[in-house]
Each structure stands twice: as C-alpha cells, then as structure tokens.
Regions:
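Non-catalytic positions within long, well-ordered alpha-helices that form the structural scaffold/packing
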Residues: 48, 176, 231-232
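Mid-to-C-terminal alpha-helical segments outside catalytic/metal-binding sites
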Residues: 128, 253-273
Length: 273
C-alpha cells in the first residue's frame, strides 16, 4: 500500500487496472504510429501486464493521411485475428479538422433520425431541433465516419497545435447536426487556446480527451500546466495515451502525480462515453 502524502507513479498507483485508453495509434501500418503487427502485439501484451482492459485504436484521418473506414476496418480485422489476449479492442479514428473532414461531413447522413445533441445551455443543433421523437431510429448506411465510444455518439477531432482551423466552429456545429458530440483530442496541447476558450467550447457541447503524457510533462511545462488546470476543473471526459510507439509506455507509467491528480485521472480512465 502506498501513501498519498507524496507523489507516486501511475504504475505504482494501480489506476491502470481495468482502465480504458481512448486514444492510440497502435493499429499497424496506417499512419505515423506503430508500423508492424509484431510491435502492436508486443504493446498489447504490455498493456495486459498493466491491467488495461479496453483500448480504442484511433488512427489519423486527414488530408495528408487519407485513410478510409473500409481500409482501417480491414487492417483492424487482421489485428484482431492475430491478437489472442483479453483486452477489448475498438476501432475509431482521429479526424483533423480540415477540408477532408468537411467533405466527409457533407457526405455523412445523420447518425440517428431525430438524435438530439445539446450544448450545456440546452440549445439543440438546428438540424435536429426540427425532428420528432418518433424519428429516432438508427441509420444503417455504410460508415462514412468512425465514431468513438460504445454508443458511437462521439467523433474524435484535433486541430493544428498553433492555429485554429478556418472553419473550426462551423465544423463542430456540423458534427453536432449529424447527431454526434465532438470529442476534442488533447486540448491542452493547443497553444492558441486559453481558459476562456475551453469554457466556451464546453458550453457549446464539446467534450475533451486528456493525453496522459501531458501530465508527465512530455510536451513541455506550459502544456502540463494547462492539462492540470483542465483536470482539476473537471473539463475532461476521458483519457488516452495517444501512443505512437512502445517507448511512450514507460514515460506514462513513470509519471508521478499527487493524490488529487491520481484520483481524478483514475475516474477518467474508468469513464465510458
């Protein structure tokens, strides 16, 4: 039993037991993450040793990496066939807010007829406000998007770290109009965002995903400070590793946190969306 009076490592705290990782680049050979099946399987074995029970594979989809749901699903099936362990694997994607995503959204039918996505002020997105309760039946169209979460109601998105996209707010509204919640990956890493912007986004119904590496200082002191503020003030819904290679696992497990931050991170690792 370890004492909460001092900082302890994430590994020693035991909070990874039963955890869900909501952001990773472990699907091999599809983006800038893991390249080989062998490396993917080795990482999964290490995850098992740490007690992680659920993993979302979220490869990039952007103009420079134009993956498709069909291509990723094929690769995902190969990984599932090769993996014999106990971690539950899910396929989603991390979408850059760019022209490629705007085009995909224009081609995507609403997730549910009449699905209502509200912001924290209770305001419905315009396209959904006109739909009735009786129309809320699932669409069965071929997938245009790869949502994240067991209910399939969230789209993991990212932006440039330095500048907001030209159609940032418009794209977020369009995601909501299709019956999804935007889940913003690693908001602490965006240099152009401040606390007021985080508050505005939360009020508009955007949810946040923490990169655990940010708490370890892996992206610098400024990012760590922002991550701790967001964590302490309850902005995050879930957490993820954003793992691109095996070396990052040790960086995460050796991260030392206070009792308060360990408890807050534990909750995020147990959360479902």
């Amino acid at each position: 039993m370890w004492s909460f009076s001092k900082k302890t490592t994430i590994a020693a705290s035991g909070i990874l037991s039963g955890a869900a990782d909501h952001h990773s680049h472990i699907l091999p050979g599809v983006d800038d993450g893991v390249e080989t099946m062998e490396e993917s399987l080795h990482i999964l074995a290490t995850y098992e040793d740490l007690g992680i029970k659920e993993l979302w594979l979220t490869p990039h989809i952007m103009e420079d990496i134009p993956n498709t749901p069909q291509k990723l699903a094929t690769r995902f099936e190969k990984l599932k066939a090769a993996y014999k362990g106990n971690i539950t694997l899910h396929l989603a994607a991390e979408y850059m807010i760019d022209n490629n995503l705007c085009k995909l959204l224009q081609e995507t039918p609403p997730r549910f007829r009449g699905e209502v996505v509200e912001d924290r002020r209770g305001e419905k997105s315009p396209a959904e406000a006109t739909m009735g309760e009786g129309d809320r039946t699932p669409k069965q169209d071929p997938p245009h998007l790869l949502p994240i979460g067991t209910a399939g109601k969230h789209i993991l998105v990212e932006t440039s770290y330095f500048n907001p996209p030209m159609k940032f707010r418009e794209t977020l509204r369009q995601i909501k109009s299709l019956g999804y919640y935007p889940l913003l990956a690693h908001p602490e890493r965006y240099m152009y965002m401040d606390n007021d912007e985080y508050r505005r986004l939360r009020e508009e119904g955007v949810k946040f995903q923490l990169n655990i590496v940010s708490l370890a200082g892996g992206y610098g002191k400024t990012v760590k400070k922002k991550a701790l503020w967001l964590l302490e003030n309850g902005f995050y819904s879930v957490a993820g590793s954003d793992l691109h290679c095996e070396d990052a696992i040790e960086y995460i497990t050796k991260c030392k946190l206070s009792k308060q931050h360990i408890e807050l991170l534990k909750q995020l690792l147990q959360n479902k969306i």
